[in-house]
């Protein structure tokens, strides 16, 4: 009951639907001292509002490659949008619908709430939600629809679509009527 009340309050404050504000369950397995497979963590992940209409939940973060197998939980670290140097970030991001009037009011200097790794190579930003991370990203649209803006074009994506993004300037805008949920795996990369 407490989770439902918290989700309802967060939904109202951040412009999300109650369904979008629900936490996701994460199950992490590992090995015990006998080398038997066990469940290390099985819990709902905390909801983390990122900006009005956007929530992000980190499931796992690593700092090196190959990543160490660990029994500690690295998901609560505050690291920003990009993965750590030589690391990875596994997350889900929810995007609430953004109507044209609200989109027009986004301040040009917003640049995804101050992400410092945007834009690439001095290319002017065409939208306040444009940003860039020095990472190779695998993404899958889990539900809803969204537009991925690039420097010279936009691509409309729907549930089930997969994206492989190679450190490009981009932005996400949900012009639909329903929230959009995207699964991301970000891996630190080297500049071309």
Language-model regions, residue ranges each:
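Double-stranded beta-helix
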Residues: 27, 31-32, 37-43, 49, ...
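Ligand-binding loop in jelly-roll beta-barrel domains
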Residues: 145-147, 154-156, 167-191
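Bacterial N-terminal signal peptides
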Residues: 7-15
């Amino acid at each position: 009951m407490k989770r439902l009340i918290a989700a309802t309050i967060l939904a109202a404050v951040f412009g999300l639907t109650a369904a979008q504000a629900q936490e996701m369950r994460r199950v992490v397995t590992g090995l015990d001292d006998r080398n038997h497979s066990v469940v290390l963590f099985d819990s709902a992940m905390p909801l983390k509002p990122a900006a009005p209409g956007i929530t992000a939940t980190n499931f796992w973060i690593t700092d090196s490659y190959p990543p160490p197998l660990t029994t500690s939980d690295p998901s609560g670290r505050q690291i920003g949008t990009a993965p750590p140097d030589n690391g990875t970030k596994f997350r889900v991001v929810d995007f609430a619908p953004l109507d044209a009037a609200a989109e027009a009011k986004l301040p040009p200097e917003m640049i995804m709430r101050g992400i410092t790794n945007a834009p690439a190579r001095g290319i002017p930003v065409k939208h306040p939600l444009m940003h860039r991370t020095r990472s190779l990203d695998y993404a899958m649209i889990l539900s809803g629809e969204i537009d991925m803006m690039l420097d010279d074009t936009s691509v409309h994506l729907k549930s089930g679509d997969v994206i492989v993004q190679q450190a490009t300037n981009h932005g996400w805008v949900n012009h639909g009527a329903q929230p959009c949920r995207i699964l991301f795996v970000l891996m630190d990369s080297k500049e071309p």
